[in-house]
Amino acid sequence: TATTTITRYFTKSRGKALSICWFGLSTAEFILPVLIVYLLTITAWQNIWIFISIIILIFLPLTSFFLIKKLDFDTREQVDIDNSEIKEIKQWKRIEVLKDYRFYIICMTMLAMPWIATGSFVYQSFISSSKEWGPYVIAQSFMAYSILSVITLFISGFLIDKFSSRKLLIYMNIPLLFGTIVLYYFDAPLSSFVFFGLVGVTNGLANVLGSSTWAEIYGVKYIGSIKALTTALMVFSTAFGTALFGFLIDIGFSIEQIAVVSGAYIFGSIILLYFVKNKLKPQYL
């Protein structure tokens, strides 16, 4: 909801606004695991959940009230004074988007990160045992993931505002592709930090591009229904990734072979996107 609102009402600084929006989540991914592990040493996990619930009940209504109290948007389409071009862009409905071949090619790129990253997170014990990294290496590697994700968030926001999401989209999964190469070739514990760090770079790019790209191509009038569709596909992709990784492990695939499968998918999606990159433009009325 937050990213959809920002996508709809911001145009000139949409990238920076989305970066700030995602900053909270990425920061929490860095801080909360360490905090929870510490709290588990002094209290039971049930007490931690009660504590979290109390904080949410107290602070969420208060912060929501004060943050939205003085918000004032004129219209959904007229988000900036200099907005004459925005009004001429065709506003695609969801049914029209589903008939556009570009949507499916973009989705192939957008959905690579969710299923590959989720599969890696869920089966981290399999990866760790295959690489003989020890029980804590991957947990420590999440710090590299979070730090690089946050850094990339801010950088991507400025890049999107300068170059547009459509031009940056083709580069989004390249760090993830290099991550699969690292996972295939290297076994040293340091490679865990490099792999998850590269995943974090793609995650930072994907968080911002995942909202702004649709708005640039299909307009903002129906961005809510379009985002609902893409979010549902993302959730399906994470479930698919978990199932696929599990299936491949069950039939005897090594983590190196899974890395090859993942890398082949990423490479294929980049090639497809390359052939249509010049067509990723909005239609003008």
List the predicted regions and their residue ranges.
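Helix-loop-helix hairpin linking two adjacent transmembrane segments in secondary transporters
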Residues: 25-72
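A late C-terminal transmembrane helix in Major Facilitator Superfamily
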Residues: 29, 217-252
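Flexible cytoplasmic inter-helical loops of multi-pass small-molecule transporters
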Residues: 68-91, 284-285
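Extracytoplasmic gate region of multi-pass secondary transporters
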Residues: 95-153
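Structural signature of the two symmetry-related core transmembrane helices
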Residues: 167-181
